[in-house]
């Protein structure tokens, strides 16, 4: 059995609240970010995230469920073809609310609600770790190559000692140049 939403409604009646949320969600999916009151943004956030979750599933049933709430077919098409697949590997947290200064006329607290366009923080951290580990792996490999070259080119012990000293000086100069950069 349907139960009414608890708490104050945006705009008075429940039908007006549904219309406000549908219009706000349409604007959010169309523009990527909207500026509204903080209360409307907080109510819109779970509403929009549920619609994005439907879009991630992408089947006909979920498309019809979204069309019950959002009447603009172009926005629904963009939601299912662009927004849903973009968040395919993300489990929730599709929107972000940023508080901004109060509205000039009535001093209402305002906020910007936007779709998160960055990939997850963990994937960025994993990429940074991979880059750091490859840099660490490359540094010892370069030193090993210098030693191998010295061993191959030396024919006698005296030549080897001179070449090792020359290679060490070259390696020190290269390290100093890297530190300056």
From Swiss-Prot:
One of its GO terms (cellular component) is cytosolic large ribosomal subunit. GO terms for biological process: translation. Residues 149-162 have a biased composition (Acidic residues). InterPro entries: Ribosomal_bL17, Ribosomal_bL17_CS, Ribosomal_bL17_sf. Residues 125-181 are annotated as: Disordered. GO terms for molecular function: structural constituent of ribosome. Keywords: Ribonucleoprotein, Ribosomal protein. The keyword Glycosyltransferase does not apply. NCBIfam families: L17. Belongs to the bacterial ribosomal protein bL17 family. Part of the 50S ribosomal subunit. Contacts protein L32. This is Large ribosomal subunit protein bL17. It comes from Mycobacteroides abscessus (strain ATCC 19977 / DSM 44196 / CCUG 20993 / CIP 104536 / JCM 13569 / NCTC 13031 / TMC 1543 / L948) (Mycobacterium abscessus). The lineage of its organism: Bacteria, Bacillati, Actinomycetota, Actinomycetes, Mycobacteriales.
């Amino acid at each position: 059995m349907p139960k009414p939403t608890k708490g104050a409604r945006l705009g008075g009646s429940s039908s007006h609240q549904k219309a406000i949320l549908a219009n706000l969600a349409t604007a959010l999916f169309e523009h990527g970010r909207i500026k509204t009151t903080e209360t409307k943004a907080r109510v819109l956030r779970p509403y929009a995230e549920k619609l994005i979750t439907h879009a991630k599933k992408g089947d006909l049933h979920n498309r019809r469920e979204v069309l019950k709430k959002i009447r603009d077919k172009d926005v629904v098409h963009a939601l299912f073809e662009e927004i849903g697949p973009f968040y395919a590997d993300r489990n929730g947290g599709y929107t972000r609310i940023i508080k901004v200064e109060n509205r000039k006329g009535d001093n209402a607290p305002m906020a910007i609600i936007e779709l998160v366009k960055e990939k997850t923080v963990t994937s960025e951290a994993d990429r940074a770790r991979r880059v750091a580990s490859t840099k660490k792996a490359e540094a010892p490999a370069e030193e090993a190559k210098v030693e191998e070259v010295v061993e191959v080119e030396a024919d006698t012990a005296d030549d080897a000692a001179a070449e090792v000293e020359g290679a060490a000086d070259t390696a020190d100069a290269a390290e100093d140049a890297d530190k300056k950069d």
